[in-house]
Amino acid sequence: MGRKKIKIQRIPDERNRQVTFNKRKNGLIKKAMELALLCDSTVSLVIVNNSPNAKEKYFQYISSGLPSPMESIPDLGPEISQKFTDHDYDKIFNKKEKGDFNDDYIGGDTASHSEEEDHKSPSSTPELLGYNHHNHHHHHHQYNNNSNNNNNNHNNNHNNYNNSNNINGHNNHYNHNNLKLNSNNNNNNSQFNSSQHINKPILSIKPSQTQENHNHYNNYSSHLSNNNNNNNSSNNNNNSNNNNNNNNNNNTNNNNTNNNNNNNNNNNNNNNNNNNNNNNNNMSPIGSPPSKCQQVPAFDSTQATQALLSLHNASKLFCSSPEDTSPMTSPRTPPFSSTNTNTLQTSPNSQQKSKSLPPLIFNENNNQNNNNQNNNQNNNNNNSNNTNTNNNNQNNSSRSILLPPISLYNSNSNSNSSSTLTSPTSSSSNLNDDLFLKKRKLELIH
């Protein structure tokens, strides 16, 4: 939509000729004023309109310090329609205040032109060319500054996207696309709209893989907290069951039996706490999301006791010295055989279980069920122990069973435990077997 070129000849239409005269007359007077002001020159301009229908016929411009040429002509003096001087430039051609212009071009009646401006743009017009030209010039510089800033942001976003693998890289990638759109908007003279578009938040970003990992990690941490709460609730239930057992024992037994029951209950509490701690330790660490490689199988105390009984009975048959009776240190441990020695003889609930030893591979969902079964079994063991101690205390009321702590590498304790296991018929040996197995489980857990 450029301006159509016209042929330089007389315009036949009077209306078009008058419009063209007004436009070009104003432009010619403006250029004459600029020449006088910028270059400190003396300019005199006289324009006469020969159109018969023109209301204004004569136009003149004189620079300062120059007499008016048309006033010296007496016949034409009164007919001068418009007279322009240097002071009329800002009133006619400039619609903005003087404070908006550069100070290099304003110096009173005559302005001094800087040499730097001539060196930078010798063919360009200064900012005193008018309001429209000044606005166009101002937007041109603003567009250049915006394009430079967009190029810098473009390069920075490229660097950030190449150097990072997290969500910030994806955000910068989308910012890069938005900056491309903004550069196109700047070419269409919409700088302000594009700047507002840059400040808008980006809502169309797809979640990256790291966001999914982060959400999965949050879900996993909540899963850990739920497991811990469930374990704490199971401990509270165990404590309440043990307290009920203690109350029943206080009603039916003597002081010696109460002391023994308290010791048994403390051992059961320690065993339950260690099982719960073991379940928490089987979880993957908090600092990393769970994976299939990090899931550790849980520890089942019921199957551990069956394994200990089988290994201990086999070690009595095949080991030559009491030092080799420990199942952790014996190199001559025989293969497992599904016999009656694999089951616990102390509790009736354990005899109902399977005689063969299943593989020690579990899921995290079965840990709490196993703990509940172990707790029920421990409570049944407490009841059976209470009946045994009642019978013993009726025969020997002054006798209390106190065993030293058993370690895996103590031959004396192993020999004592083996001697107690050789007599399964008596009730005191059954109680010693139960205490030995519980302490051995605690040592294996630690």
Swiss-Prot record:
Q: Cite the entry's keywords alphabetically.
A: DNA-binding, Nucleus, Transcription, Transcription regulation
Subcellular locations according to the entry: Nucleus
> Which GO biological-process labels does this protein carry?
positive regulation of transcription by RNA polymerase II
Region (Disordered) spans which residues?
95-195, 210-296, 319-432
Biased composition, class Low complexity, residue ranges? 143-195, 216-282, 365-432
SMART domains from the xrefs? Answer: MADS
Q: Compositional bias (Polar residues) at which positions?
A: 322-355
Biased region (Basic and acidic residues) positions are: 112-121
Primary site of residence: nucleus
Query: Is Transcription one of the keywords UniProt gives this record?
Result: yes
This chain's protein is named Serum factor response D
Gene that produces this protein:
srfD
Q: Where is the composition biased (Basic residues)?
A: 133-142
MADS-box domain location is 1-61
